[in-house]
UniProtKB/Swiss-Prot annotation:
Gene field: env
Full protein name: Envelope glycoprotein gp160
Region of interest (V2), residue spans: 160-204
Bilayer-crossing regions: 680-700
Organism: Human immunodeficiency virus type 1 group M subtype K (isolate 97ZR-EQTB11) (HIV-1)
Lipid moiety-binding region (S-palmitoyl cysteine): C759
Post-translational modification: Highly glycosylated by host. The high number of glycan on the protein is reffered to as 'glycan shield' because it contributes to hide protein sequence from adaptive immune system. Palmitoylation of the transmembrane protein and of Env polyprotein (prior to its proteolytic cleavage) is essential for their association with host cell membrane lipid rafts. Palmitoylation is therefore required for envelope trafficking to classical lipid rafts, but not for viral replication.
Pfam families: GP120, GP41
Domain notes for this protein: Some of the most genetically diverse regions of the viral genome are present in Env. They are called variable regions 1 through 5 (V1 through V5). Coreceptor usage of gp120 is determined mainly by the primary structure of the third variable region (V3) in the outer domain of gp120. The sequence of V3 determines which coreceptor, CCR5 and/or CXCR4 (corresponding to R5/macrophage, X4/T cell and R5X4/T cell and macrophage tropism), is used to trigger the fusion potential of the Env complex, and hence which cells the virus can infect. Binding to CCR5 involves a region adjacent in addition to V3. The membrane proximal external region (MPER) present in gp41 is a tryptophan-rich region recognized by the antibodies 2F5, Z13, and 4E10. MPER seems to play a role in fusion.
């Protein structure tokens, strides 16, 4: 009884243990995390890509071709979308912004492109005979807003005559034109007439000059830079953003605001304004070598004019080429100038000094430029095709201007301008007929700070207007933008696991994963199938590389195809969008996630990648924070997902190979039973027919041998001998051993007897065949074994013989060598003894002679 009680307790304990073990397994399985792929996550990283332009070019004058080629840009979006990113902090750096470099390169390319079809002024590098243009007028008061001042004859313009080639290259003619004094250099003074001199164009010994086409306009048109698909532009909306550091108010846009490509120095014109206070921006404000960009919060209007009523004439300098020059000046020769409201400018300068004082805690002093290149020491800008060089000394002095006063900035016009983007290349701006007036807004300044060794002891800091690097102009507008690349593929741990075919994972040779795209061409089909993933990836890389090569070819043929830089950028942007999409879809396809936004995998999550719990990840972290945490392990996770998918595909392929055995279960389908019965009846009928045929043939054979056929109804006993009596009634005696033929009656009995005899016949013959085959196989194996034993003994015998022969040969050789060595030693010894005894033999010979 006690044994039975213990047995019952163990049974209950076993059931409870199994239940507890099952719960433990379920709980442990529930705590396992698996890698899950997400497509479309809000993750980005800093990138450098090709931007394209958008512009409302059709809204401007259509008769002229603007140098910015905005007609090749896409139209602007009438309803631009801007999405504010909540709880996002992003770092910006305007001094290391590729958008600035890209815009700088684009503007250079646009200037070059606009000048390609224009006339080269190399034939003008001849001796110019120049005289001063005389015009006796008086200068106006500085405070007069309607300036009618004129310059003296030696100030600005000279009338020059020179020889030039006509339409016929072997003919020359003398022509004259007016040149600004800044555009010519005196060669020598005339000895006869002091007012006459020999001059040349200023560029003839340094650079080539291209005349701007007369239909080209330099009027700045707003350009919107746009990011291609797969990329985005982040915008910092902090009102006090200084262009560097973290920004907490971030939004994403597809295009920037309209940026006017104004080429100017010292003063920034027609840009954007600060929303609150004046912003001071510098890469390192403690270094005096770094420029300081000042963004104003209120625009200051500046009105510039060239009051002289000039006329323009065309001078033919060869077949199909014309040079446009100033023909005459109608009326007074008055100086170009700009007017600024004194009170407004004085207020702005004081605010700038106040902001600079916050950074240096010293007295701020503004001084004029200390000298250098005219493009830096003067405020340069373009007004309706005329390039003006203005002296800004009066704008930085410390005199307090009254509210109603006007600051007049004198300007000088140059027609030959050294292009700010290239060395050894200049542009000739054709004169513009009539009066010229431009109204602009000063929205910023570019300053430089004086250096020195006594910075710590000085109580003043001196700032001067600067510029010259057009990148600073573009930075003043692009400081709040940065380009990022959207990474829509994200990975995170979840408890969901992909249901796959469970098979033992086989090792894959690591060398196969590094084969080239065509490296598996000579491998077997099975070996090449392992590298399909690598081939797909390298095929896409080849497509991308080919597209880049094609674009480089198009860019090289830009002049032939008449493509502007915007056309190239649009081609790049479109191809780049396709490449980005194909790459993402290729990765999803390799991972077995095509067409899925959320895709589970069979890769277990490794705690070394991140040991945070699932709740900490999904409830407390953003996708950007999560991506930064696992960024060092992303490539490893991608590789494991890829290997898992490859193994799954192999398992599925093996499973498909086993599907043919699944059709065996269909044999038991009731719908197939009638077909089975029909086949059975056909087989039985065939066997019966064969039996009948064989029976008829047997009867015919016996009849031919002289026997009569047996009766189908009578059983005839076999005859007995006289010495073999039948058995007695008591059952004694020997039983009869003669067989009697059993007669059957009925069709089924006959069929069953025939089938039984046929099966026995087949069994006996198959048994005999198997026995014969077994006997033959046994004899063959025994013979093979005997042959192998004989061959092995033969090998051992001949091996021993060869060994003995080698030993004998070695012994014989050793003996021969030893005997030869002994003989050689003996001969050498005897020769040595003979040589040694020569003096003795000589002495003995002398002794015999003496005796």
């Amino acid at each position: 009884m006690r044994a039975r009680e213990i047995q019952r307790n163990w049974q209950h304990l076993g059931k409870r243990g199994i239940l507890f073990l099952g719960i433990l397994i379920i709980c442990s399985a529930a705590n396992n995390l698996w890698v899950t792929v997400y497509y479309g996550v809000p993750v980005w990283k800093e990138a450098t890509t090709t931007l394209f332009c958008a512009s409302d070019a059709k809204a401007y004058e259509t008769e002229v071709h603007n140098v910015w080629a905005t007609h090749a840009c896409v139209p602007t979006d009438p309803n631009p979308q801007e999405v504010v990113l909540e709880n996002v902090t992003e770092n910006f750096n305007m001094w290391k912004n590729n958008m600035v470099e890209q815009m700088h390169t684009d503007i250079i390319s646009l200037w070059d492109e606009s000048l390609k079809p224009c006339v080269k002024l190399t034939p003008l590098c001849v001796t110019l005979t120049c005289t001063n243009v005389t015009n006796n007028r008086t200068n106006a008061n500085k405070n007069d807003t309607n300036i009618n001042a004129t310059v003296t004859s030696t100030d600005e313009i000279k009338n020059c005559s020179f020889n030039i080639t006509t339409e016929l290259k072997d003919k020359k003619k003398r022509v004259s034109a007016l040149f600004y004094k800044l555009d010519i250099v005196q060669i020598k003074q005339s000895e006869i007439n002091q007012s006459e001199s020999e001059d040349r164009l200023i560029n003839c010994n340094t650079s080539t000059v291209t005349q701007a086409c007369p239909k080209v306009s330099f009027e700045p048109i707003p350009i919107h830079y746009c990011a291609p698909a797969g990329f985005a532009i982040l915008k910092c909306n902090n009102n006090t953003c200084n262009g560097t550091g973290p920004c907490t108010n971030v939004s994403t846009v597809q295009c920037t605001h309209g940026i006017k490509p104004v080429v100017s120095t010292q003063l920034l014109l027609n840009g954007s304004l600060a929303e609150e206070e004046i912003i001071i921006r510098s890469e390192d404000i403690t270094k005096n070598t770094k420029n300081i960009i000042v963004q104003l919060n209120e625009a200051v209007e500046i009105n510039c004019t060239r009051p002289s009523n000039n006329t323009r004439k065309s001078i033919h300098i060869g077949p199909g080429r014309a040079f446009y020059a100033t023909g005459d000046i109608i009326g007074d020769i008055r100086q170009a100038h700009c007017n600024i409201s004194g009170g407004q400018w004085n207020k702005t300068v004081n605010q700038v000094k106040k902001e600079l004082g916050k950074h240096f805690n010293k007295t701020i002093i503004f001084q004029p430029s200390s000298g250098g290149d005219p493009q830096v020491t003067r405020h340069i800008f373009n007004c309706r095709g005329e390039f003006s060089y203005c002296d800004t000394t009066d704008t930085v002095d410390d005199t307090e201007e009254e509210e109603d006063t006007t600051i007049t900035i004198p300007c000088r016009i140059k027609q030959i301008i050294n292009m700010w983007q290239k060395v050894g290349q200049a542009i000739y701006a054709p004169p513009t007929a009539g009066n010229i007036t431009c109204r602009s807004n000063i929205t910023g300044m570019i300053l430089t700070r004086d250096g020195g060794n006594d910075n710590n002891t000085r109580t003043e800091e001196t700032f001067r207007p600067g510029g010259g690097d057009m990148r600073d102009n573009w930075r003043s507008e692009l400081y709040k933008y940065k380009v990022v690349q959207i990474e829509p593929l994200g990975i995170a741990p979840t408890r969901a696991r992909r249901r796959v075919v469970q098979r033992e994972k086989r090792a894959v040779g690591i060398g196969a994963l590094f084969l080239g795209f065509l490296g598996a061409a000579g491998s077997t089909m099975g070996a090449a199938s392992i590298t399909l993933t690598v081939q797909a990836r390298q095929l896409l890389s080849g497509i991308v590389q080919q597209q880049n090569n094609l674009l480089r070819a198009i860019e090289a043929q830009q002049q032939m195809l008449q493509l502007t830089v915007w056309g190239i950028k649009q081609l790049r942007a479109r191809v780049l969008a396709v490449e980005r999409y194909l790459r993402d879809q290729q990765l999803l396809g390799i991972w077995g996630c095509s067409g899925k936004l959320i895709c589970t995998t069979n890769v277990p999550w490794n705690s070394s990648w991140s040991n945070k719990s699932q709740s900490e990840i999904w409830e407390n972290m953003t996708w950007m924070q999560w991506e930064k945490e696992i960024s060092n392990h992303t490539s490893t996770i991608y590789r494991l997902i890829e290997e898992s998918q490859i193994q799954q595909e192999k398992n599925e392929q093996d499973l498909l190979a086993l599907d043919k055995w699944a059709s065996l279960w269909n044999w038991f389908d009731i719908s197939n039973w009638l077909w089975y019965i029909k086949i059975f009846i056909m087989i039985v009928g065939g066997l019966i027919g064969l039996r009948i045929v064989f029976t008829v043939l047997s009867v015919v054979n016996r009849v031919r041998q002289g026997y009569s056929p047996l009766s189908f109804q009578t059983l005839t006993p076999s005859p007995r001998g006289p010495d073999r009596p039948e058995g007695i009634e008591e059952g004694g005696g020997e039983q009869d051993k003669d067989r009697s033929v059993r007669l059957v009656s009925g069709f089924l009995a006959l069929a069953w007897d025939d089938l039984r005899n046929l099966c026995l016949f087949s069994y006996r013959h198959l048994r005999d065949l198997v026995l014969i085959a077994t006997r033959i196989l046994d004899r063959g194996l025994k013979g093979s074994w005997e042959a192998l034993k004989y061959l092995w003994n033969l090998i051992l015998y001949w091996g021993q013989e060869i060994k003995n022969s080698a030993i004998n040969l070695l012994n014989t050789t050793a003996i021969a060598v030893a005997e030869g060595t002994d003989r050689i030693i003996e001969i050498v010894y005897r020769a040595f003894r003979a040589l040694l005894h020569i003096p003795r033999r000589i002495r003995q010979g002398f002794e015999r002679l003496l005796l």
